[in-house]
């Protein structure tokens, strides 16, 4: 067996991507961590959404958000971002199925960073309603993405959540796992 530097590099790269133990697989575990419904209040998720916002800004050749703008180090509630459910947790327009609650409600595809004021103003209304849709027509590029979907498809359900999740997961893979 060759023990050259290239071989050592390949083995270490493999271990970094696939884990040092069978049960510790960075590719699988990392993706499950950010796509599983039970982790939706984790700080790391806010970080991923912040990085996704800056990824979209960079693609559009726009200035990036600073961490301070996103984490609100100045404790100014008016500019603080909160983790928002695009379709609300307790809607006033529909009753969710058990499957929807388990698979989609807290999915990363249904979560966005939103200011406290807008999150509060949305209440529990349908995100496809005109007044709510307009809240996503903002300076944030991740919101523009949601806004365009809501305007063109006039709904936010399993399909839109899955499509958004897939875009964010692709971003995670491209930036941290490959």
Predicted features, each with a name:
Residues 1-2, 76-79, 150-155:
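Short, exposed beta-strand "edge-strand" segments with a Pro/Gly-rich flavor and a Y/T-containing core
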Residues 1-9:
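Single conserved hydrophobic/aromatic residue that forms the stacking wall/gate
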